[in-house]
Curated annotation (Swiss-Prot):
Similarity comment: Belongs to the HEM-1/HEM-2 family.
Subunit details: Part of a Scar/WAVE complex containing brk1, scrA, abiA, pirA and napA.
Species whose genome carries this gene: Nematostella vectensis
Protein name in the entry: Nck-associated protein 1 homolog
Any Pfam family matching the protein: Nckap1
Function field: Involved in regulation of actin and microtubule organization. Involved in cell adhesion.
Biological process annotations from GO: cell adhesion; cell migration; cell morphogenesis; cell projection assembly; cortical actin cytoskeleton organization; neuron projection morphogenesis
Keywords on record: Cell adhesion
InterPro entries (UniProt xref): Nck-associated_protein-1
Length: 1120
């Protein structure tokens, strides 16, 4: 430095500011290089290339003097461009660090030459910047020495550069020497700091009182009520005051680093009185300090190694050993501090939430509380995540704090409070600056009689800038920028702290005190986020992911701490604050890490809530099931057995019977049941989930409630499906009424979540149950619609034909013979099918109907094949049905008549079941949406039949469970069987009716065709033929344009003729003859096209009357 430069030309303030900012950037870059070189996945490939291994060994051995013509280096020749491209970022980072070191050394020398006086209580910003530069330089050089591949990287790059350009890279000689010098960074730095020890010692001595005050125990804090804003109610509105506000929220760990590194670099000062005590006190606080992020410095070991071997430092080494031995006491001290902070910060949060106007006057206390909480959290993290020295009787569990989540939550609460009321703070401190501060500043400036022009201009600018402020600027949303004011104050500190300056800062403490407060107030206007980050940034957890996740898991499992687990995803929003503009490439990795962490935490919280809720729902369902009528007999048996049970000694042994609802009677409030514990856990967890509506993390917004909603949807969907208990192998499924009852019980339990979380459970139910009406849900999994459709069609309807199950129109259900283990009525009566309609909804019932229609279409397709096979005979029968002899002969020529009748019965059974589910759906919808159903009914009845949109109306009505003359689903299913020529199609389906008509008498020869009056059904379900004939005829005629009434009249005529021939066979014992006669009446009664007049014109009514009389006289074995 030239001695001719004036104090203003030296620009000490500007240089300190720039170098500190650049030093942080250099630390970030060297940190990433160290991590990259230590990780095999990110390590430069050249360093692991087997072909380059001899070259690298040679470079490391000869570094920095290497012979470029050495044979070991020939392998680099072919890849010199790739080496330079791959290692240039690494190399020039070291070059930048060397330049930073040179600039920092030059500035420290200039400061010494100017005899700058440092005092943290006088020129805080200048002193802090000076000490920060010393610590940053020390940490940077230690980090350089920790990069294991530094010699190989630098030497390899320089050799490739020299091979390409014919000369060494210009910075390499100095860079190589720096690498050699700083292999032992502490000793080298101590040598360099010999000229600076006077300035360093002066700055550090001003910290002694502050460090002692900040190192008090938790009990001393509690007695002093240092964080209480209501300890003096009369002064609750009085602003927090301090001569140097920034000192109040200056962290102990920062002071500790200043003291440790400062005095150790200037170890000659340790012999001076008072300095040793403060240095030893710092050494007793744990066993490590933070260098940068998760890089720590084991100071006992490192300082011991540094001083070992130096003459006259045996006593200092003994002090280090004593401090290490007393380290265990710090664990209890920090634990006591955290206990106090939890209660103090919680109290502060509650008061400020009730009275946010106190944020302004008590902001200094808030920042103080956040800073010491932040300090304690960082101390705990670095000591938990780094193993203690083996010689110390400490384990990692000694440092672990199960109540850490509570402290993290308290910090986050205070942060969110400050951020929420940002405008309140701005209004308060703008008024403070433009009122009290500027008034006092004018008076203080007037007292200064002698000052240079530069200083006069700076102080005048202070007054002008503060005088121009007004609250209207806050109301209009104007952005404030006080960075220039703060930099001018730093310049003023530098100008007036130099020996011989006029005026000297130490002679104007009123100005110092006032400007320190002005700077503090200005930061709370334009740098609120930065100030909060300074005292409460928890981005350190980004670099301790294992500890972060482990703490979260423990918090989630601890019922007393689970309400605070929301702090962990909130902390993920801090991660991006640790990034640096000097290393933009790390933004995406850190951002991705923050996103994955917050997603993991919120997902785990939602899953835990879901798991607890599933257990609660299971217990509620069990309690609900105790009220089912199926459990009534067992309950009565258990009640009776209480009175009869005795042991061998004739002593009464009561088997305690617990009736439903007994759990509601409590003997004491203290006794918690398992359900109580689960509900308590759920309440605590839901409190965490609902703590905030949104969590911003790296340009993303996360909504905790949405995670819970998605988990509840997934859980509810799986629960509904599991309630069906569908067993494919054993072909079993739960009764729809039981499933519906369980679903309603679960919905009732889930609905209680609204009391805890405000989650819209109605949306969850609608979303899940709507998906359950489809064959597959959004995840592609089978739903209850698919399961019940498969079971009813592939299992139940098959059993109808094979196990003797009968459709009873009288009971409106399918029933089976007594003694069978399977009860068809339990799945097909009115209550069950209405329950099925509620579960499947209109969409699900339509899907079930479509699948039934496909089965009918399959049967009709087979019938069509049989008709075509017998086409010639059927054509002849159609024209000669009134000629007995010819007709009998033609009937004998027909093939597969029994097959035709069986398929018609199958179709009829499917259609009968279809009718039952349609009636159930209609009943349910009339209860649920009566207005809409009345509109559909009116439209179905009054919409013109000739209109082109009539089919749409019928489809709507059918989907709502209403009966139409022609089923549109059946029409659509049979449309695929239509012939190209309508004449051929009409003929084919007309012949099918002829086939059925002449085949009906064959049923009279089967005993299974007898009619059961109690069920109003035939034992072989022959009565279902009436449904199949009417429905198929209507659908086929609708598709091909034929007249269904003509076809049915023809069918009636042929059937009547065929059945009347049975009466002439008196010599044969046809038990089912009268039962078959009834089929004709059923066809007419169910047909929308035929009337009894038409029937009487071709079949005597007397025969029907006698047939009904005959079948109802018979007594059949009852069906159950």
């Amino acid at each position: 430095m030239e001695r001719g430069l004036s104090v203003t030309e030296q620009k000490l303030a500007e240089k300190l500011t720039i170098l500190n900012e650049r030093g942080e950037g250099m630390l970030t870059r060297i940190y990433n290089i160290k991590k990259a070189c230590s990780d095999p996945k990110s390590r430069p490939g050249f360093l692991m290339d087997k072909a380059l291994e001899p070259s690298i060994k040679y470079i490391v051995r000869k570094f920095p003097q290497m012979d470029t013509k050495a044979t070991q280096l020939q392998a680099v020749q072919s890849i010199q461009n790739e080496v330079m491209k791959g290692l240039s970022n690494y190399y020039f980072t070291f070059v930048d660090i060397m330049e930073f070191k040179d600039n920092a050394s030059e500035l420290l020398t200039a400061i010494d030459a100017s005899f700058v006086h440092f005092d943290i209580t006088l020129n805080f910003d200048l002193t802090k910047a000076y000490l920060d530069l010393i610590v940053t330089l020390t940490a940077l050089m230690i980090m350089v020495s920790r990069v294991d591949d530094r010699r190989s990287v630098l030497g390899l790059f320089n050799h490739a550069f020299e091979m390409r350009n014919g000369r060494s890279e210009e910075s390499f000689p100095r860079l190589g020497q720096m690498i050699l010098d700083y292999d032992s960074p502490l000793k080298k730095l101590a040598e360099q700091f010999v000229p600076h020890q006077q300035r360093v010692s002066t700055a550090l001595q001003s910290l002694h009182e502050i460090y002692l005050r900040k190192s008090m125990t938790g009990e001393q804090w509690r007695q002093g009520q240092i964080l209480s804003i209501i300890n003096a109610p009369a002064n609750i509105l009085v602003p927090g005051q301090s001569k140097v506000p920034a000192v109040e929220y200056l962290e102990v760990s920062v002071i500790q680093r200043w003291i440790m590194f400062g005095y150790t670099m200037c170890h000659q000062q340790l012999a001076m009185p008072g300095i040793t005590d403060i240095w030893k006190m710092a050494l007793q606080d744990g066993f490590c300090i933070t260098l940068f992020r998760d890089e720590i410095f084991m100071f006992h070991k490192e300082f011991h190694n540094m001083l070992d071997g130096m003459k006259g430092y045996g006593k200092r080494i003994k002090d280090i050993q004593d401090a290490a031995n007393q380290m265990a006491a710090s664990v209890g001290i920090h634990k006591e501090r955290r206990n106090y902070l939890r209660s103090a910060l919680t109290e502060m949060t509650l008061i400020l939430a009730d009275q946010p106007g106190l944020l302004g006057p008590k902001m200094l206390i808030i920042l103080h509380g956040l800073s010491i909480a932040h300090d304690e959290i960082l101390w705990l993290v670095r000591h938990c995540c780094n193993p203690a020295p083996r010689s110390r009787k400490l384990t990692q569990e000694d440092f672990f704090d199960s109540k850490l989540p509570h402290l993290l939550f308290a910090v986050e609460e205070l942060r969110s409070m400050v951020q929420k009321y940002s405008s309140v703070l701005q209004r308060y401190f703008i008024q403070y600056l433009s009122g009290f501060d500027v008034y006092m500043l004018k008076q203080v400036v007037q007292k200064i009689s002698i000052c240079s022009e530069d200083i006069s201009l700076i102080m005048t600018s202070f007054i002008d800038e503060l005088s121009s402020l007004s609250v209207k600027q806050v109301e209009s949303g104007e952005l404030f920028h006080f960075s220039g004011l703060r930099l001018d104050w730093l310049r003023l500190q530098a100008y007036t702290s130099v020996r011989g300056s006029s005026p000297e800062l130490k002679d104007n403490r009123d100005l110092v005190e006032l400007m320190n407060n002005v700077v503090f107030h200005s930061k709370l206007v334009d740098l609120q986020d930065e100030t909060l980050a300074e005292v409460s940034d928890l981005s350190i957890f980004c670099f301790y992911p294992g500890f972060f996740e482990e703490s979260f898991v423990r918090c989630l499992e601890d019922i007393t701490q689970s309400r605070y687990c929301i702090a962990f995803p909130l902390i993920c929003g801090h991660f991006m604050t640790c990034t640096s503009d000097f290393c933009p490439e790390e933004r995406h990795p850190i951002g991705d890490r923050s996103l994955s962490a917050v997603n993991l935490f919120l997902d785990s919280m939602a899953k835990e809530a879901r798991n607890i809720m599933s257990q609660v729902c299971s217990e509620h369902i069990q309690q609900h099931q105790q009220l089912w009528h199926t459990h009534a007999v067992r309950m009565m048996t258990e009640m009776a057995s209480e009175r009869r049970t005795k042991d061998k000694n004739k002593k009464n042994v009561h088997v305690e019977f617990k009736p439903p609802g007994i759990e509601s009677f409590r003997k004491s409030r203290e006794t918690l049941t398992s359900l109580d514990t689960k509900l308590l856990s759920l309440t605590e967890l839901c409190h965490a989930i609902t703590h905030t509506e949104a969590i911003p993390v790296w340009e993303h917004i996360f909504a905790p409630k949405e995670y819970l909603s998605s988990q509840l949807e997934e859980f509810f969907a799986k629960a509904v499906v599991s309630m069906a208990q569908y067993d494919i192998d054993n072909q079993r499924i739960a009764r729809p009424s039981e499933v519906l009852s369980n679903v309603k019980a679960m919905m009732s339990s889930l609905r209680s979540l609204e009391n805890y979380t405000g989650v819209d459970t109605a949306r969850v139910f609608n979303h899940v149950l709507l998906q359950q009406t489809q064959p597959q849900d959004s995840q592609g999994a089978n739903t209850i619609t698919q399961m019940y459709t498969t079971w009813y069609l592939d299992v139940f309807l098959r059993r109808v034909m094979t196990d003797g199950i009968v459709y009873s129109p009288r009971r409106m259900a399918f029933v089976n013979r007594p003694g069978m283990p399977f009860r068809a009525e339990e799945y097909t009566d009115v209550n069950e099918l209405q329950a099925l309609a509620e579960l499947l909804g209109a969409y699900g019932m339509r899907y079930l109907g479509e699948k039934m229609m496909l089965q009918i279409a399959s049967q009709v397709s087979e019938l069509k094949k049989l008709v075509i096979m017998n086409k010639d005979v059927l054509v002849a029968l159609r024209t000669n049905f009134d000629k007995p002899e010819q007709c009998i002969e033609l009937i004998r020529r027909l093939r597969n008549m029994d097959d035709v009748m069986l398929r018609m019965i199958i179709i009829g059974v499917i259609l009968s079941f279809r009718q039952l589910i349609q009636q159930a759906l209609d009943s349910v919808l009339k209860t649920r949406v009566p207005y809409m159903m009345s509109c559909i009914t009116d439209m179905r009845k009054n919409f013109p039949h000739g209109n082109n949109d009539r089919q749409v109306v019928d489809e709507m009505a059918t989907s709502a469970g209403q009966e139409c003359v022609v089923d549109p689903l059946l029409c659509a299913a049979l449309r695929t069987l239509k012939e190209k020529k309508s004449e051929d199609d009409i003929l084919t389906w007309s012949l099918l009716l002829v086939f059925v008509a002449v085949g009906l008498p064959s049923l009279a020869y089967k005993d299974a065709s007898e009619y059961n009056g109690e069920l109003e059904a035939h034992d072989n379900n022959a009565h279902c033929i009436s449904s199949s004939v009417n429905s198929i005829t209507g659908a086929l005629c609708s598709n091909n344009g034929d007249n269904p009434e003509d076809r049915l009249r023809e069918f009636l005529a042929i059937t009547s003729s065929s059945l009347l021939k049975l009466g002439m066979e008196a010599e044969k014992d046809l038990k089912a003859r009268e039962s078959v006669y009834l089929l004709l009446d059923m066809v007419v009664q169910q047909s929308p096209y035929l009337t009894m007049d038409v029937l009487e014109s071709c079949f005597p009514y007397a025969l029907l009357r006698n047939a009904y009389h005959e079948v109802y006289q018979k007594r059949k074995e009852p069906f159950l």
